[in-house]
């Protein structure tokens, strides 16, 4: 019975993630083009909006992680987060200038507070032998939904001639279904009010170091939007740009579960180092790339990085964290990464506008190398 309940929980979260990303990625392939070409924002403004969104993701997850542990409830944060995502896309469809996007971006990204409580549930019902697989499966379903969303976007945009606004409205529906699935199928397991607070002395030196180096890496991990705009300015037609987004998302979808299994077999630290190395190689490639084929290959490399980094980092943090603080520390991890993401995308946009297109990649490469060096001092727990 317990095993059946755990399978239902993982299956429900996987289905909800699939549907939510289906909606999200009907928007993402054309989002930077919508913001810059239709609403008239420049690259610095795009970087500010993207960085603000990433920072809000982390702030919301840190808060929800703490509250989830404090009140002993997870489910309410999860279904509410999916509802926020649905409502925000209606707002995007109604926006007439880039300034209108900001409140709806805040609503959208603050809805990510579902992440830490959901990850805590998954970590709690998993074992050391299947934790990487479970997180990898969740990420694989995320990415599979993204692939389907991108295909839908390409079909609606390129072949049916749908406007951005109609696509955004349709994209609101899957996340609403995700909220209903969680409401109906996830049974709240009372975890109790676990603790009164969390301080640095509760964290091991190992965990503190990993959080620090994650911040270093995140400071250079700019938004995917820069890659899409780079491709357009490199010479790819506007209608082809979503296909590049599809390429890296499909790779991430296919490879997330294998990377999760590799992490179970060879350790989380090795796969985190591999993911950072893949990102560094991608940055190096964008500095020197001179062919269309090379750009496509670098998007594939970015997909491999996403497949390795996203699930394995969360699994690694959940193992380094004391069990009673797990949701809070997962939220704190997202907070640190997101607060660094705001200046990361903003700095990348400023470097792009004031220096040259290769400058953001060189900046990110330097920080990636530093993070890899620091990772050598983190011990597998």
PLM regions and their residue ranges:
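Helix-loop boundary and gating motifs at the non-cytosolic
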Residues: 2-57, 207-244
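Cytoplasmic helix-loop-helix junction between adjacent transmembrane helices
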Residues: 103-144, 316
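A membrane-interface helix-boundary motif in multi-pass transporters
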Residues: 155-173, 350-367
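Central cavity-lining transmembrane alpha-helices of secondary-active solute carriers
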Residues: 48-66, 246-258
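Structural signature of the two symmetry-related core transmembrane helices
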Residues: 76-90, 172, 270-285, 365
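Hydrophobic core of transmembrane alpha-helices in multi-pass small-molecule transporters
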Residues: 18, 88-89, 99-114, 215, ...
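C-terminal membrane-cytosol helix-exit motif in multi-pass small-molecule transporters
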Residues: 172-192, 371-379
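Helix-to-loop junctions at the C-terminal end of transmembrane segments
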Residues: 60-72, 157, 255-267, 352-353
């Amino acid at each position: 019975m317990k095993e059946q309940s755990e399978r239902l929980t993982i299956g429900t979260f996987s289905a909800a993630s699939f549907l939510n990303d289906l909606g999200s990625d009907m928007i993402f392939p054309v989002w930077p083009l919508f913001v810059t070409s239709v609403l008239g924002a420049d690259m610095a403004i795009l970087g500010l909006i993207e960085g603000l969104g990433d920072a809000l993701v982390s702030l919301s997850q840190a808060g929800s992680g703490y509250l989830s542990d404090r009140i002993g409830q997870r489910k309410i944060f999860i279904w509410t987060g999916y509802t926020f995502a649905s409502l925000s896309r209606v707002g995007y469809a109604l926006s007439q200038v880039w300034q209108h996007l900001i409140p709806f971006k805040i609503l959208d990204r603050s809805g990510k507070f579902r992440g830490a409580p959901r990850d805590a549930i998954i970590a709690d019902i998993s074992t050391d032998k299947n934790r990487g697989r479970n997180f990898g499966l969740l990420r694989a379903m995320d990415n599979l939904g993204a692939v389907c969303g991108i295909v839908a976007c390409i079909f609606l945009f390129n072949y049916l001639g749908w406007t951005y606004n109609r696509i955004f409205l349709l994209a609101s529906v899957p996340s609403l279904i995700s909220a209903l699935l969680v409401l109906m199928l996830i049974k709240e397991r009372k975890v109790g009010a676990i603790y009164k607070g969390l301080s640095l002395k509760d964290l091991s030196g190992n965990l503190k170091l990993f959080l620090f180096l994650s911040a270093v890496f995140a400071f250079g991990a700019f938004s995917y939007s820069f890659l899409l705009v780079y491709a357009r300015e490199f010479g790819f037609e506007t209608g082809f740009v979503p296909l590049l987004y599809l390429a890296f998302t499909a790779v991430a979808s296919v490879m997330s579960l294998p990377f999760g299994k590799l992490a179970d077999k060879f350790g989380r630290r090795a796969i985190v180092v591999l993911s950072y190395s893949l990102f560094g190689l991608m940055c190096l490639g964008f500095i020197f790339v001179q062919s269309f084929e090379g750009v496509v290959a670098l998007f594939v490399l970015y997909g491999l990085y996403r497949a390795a980094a996203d699930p394995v980092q969360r699994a690694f943090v959940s193992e380094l964290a004391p069990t009673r603080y797990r949701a809070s520390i997962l939220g704190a991890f997202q907070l640190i990464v997101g607060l660094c993401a705001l200046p990361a995308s903003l700095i990348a946009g400023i470097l792009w506008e004031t220096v040259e297109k290769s400058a953001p990649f060189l900046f990110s490469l330097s920080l990636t190398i530093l993070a890899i060096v620091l990772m050598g001092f983190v011990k597998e727990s």
